[in-house]
Curated annotation (Swiss-Prot):
UniProt source species: Streptococcus pyogenes serotype M5 (strain Manfredo)
Lineage: Bacteria, Bacillati, Bacillota, Bacilli, Lactobacillales
GO CC terms: cytoplasm; ribosome
Protein known as: Ribosome maturation factor RimM
GO terms classed as biological process: ribosomal small subunit biogenesis; rRNA processing
Database matches in Gene3D superfamilies: PRC-barrel domain (2.30.30.240), RimM (2.40.30.60)
Quaternary data: Binds ribosomal protein uS19.
Keyword GTP-binding in record: no
Superkingdom of origin organism: Bacteria
Encoding gene (name): rimM
InterPro entries xref list: PRC-brl_dom, PRC_barrel-like_sf, RimM, RimM_N, RimM_N_sf, Transl_B-barrel_sf
Length: 172
């Protein structure tokens, strides 16, 4: 079965079985909602078990979650450092124009048929996502995911077409 990272358990939260998660999910509210099915993977990336979310809330930069049948700190402390993943079957459907991060990462980025580089990661600093584009012989390019910049995303062909606004690429 194929799984995709959605977060890392960084610590416990209180004594009632809550965990502090650093999310890397494209849809955190959906991914960590009550009833969601996730999988726990240990620090060696080995599958441990399936878990069900029974509560979720945001606190600062973290998602605070609780699993079904794990209601005390003693039951969850061993999971610190573990990774939460969603199975491909539990990902859910997307609206047109929406993408999963794993679909975008690795895509080739072009401006007017000139290869700029490849998307290596996606940041969520605020109002919009920022795609980090790895370029050959240059510093990484921070590409805001906004309509005037990202013109098209072709998932089947792993291609993104962009128009770089003035000042966006300080190495040109």
């Amino acid at each position: 079965m194929e799984y995709f990272n959605v977060g890392k358990i960084v610590n416990t939260q209180g004594l009632q079985g809550e965990m502090r998660v650093l999310s890397v999910s494209d849809f955190a509210e959906e991914r960590f909602k009550k009833g969601s099915q996730l999988a726990l993977f240990d620090d060696k990336d080995q599958f441990v078990q399936e878990v069900t979310i029974v509560s979720h809330r945001k606190q600062k930069n973290f998602d605070i979650i609780k699993f079904k049948d794990m209601y005390h700190i003693n039951a969850i402390e061993k999971y610190k450092g573990y990774t939460l993943k969603v199975s491909k079957a539990n990902q859910g459907d997307l609206q047109e124009g929406e993408f999963y991060y794993h679909q975008i990462i690795g895509m080739a980025v072009y401006e007017k048929d000139r290869l700029i580089g490849y998307v290596k990661e996606i940041l969520q600093p605020g109002a919009n996502d920022v795609w980090v584009v790895k370029r050959q012989g240059k510093r990484d390019l921070l590409l805001p995911y906004i309509p005037p910049v990202v013109l098209s995303v072709d998932v089947p062909n792993k291609r993104v077409d962009v128009e770089l606004m003035e000042g966006l690429d300080d190495e040109d």
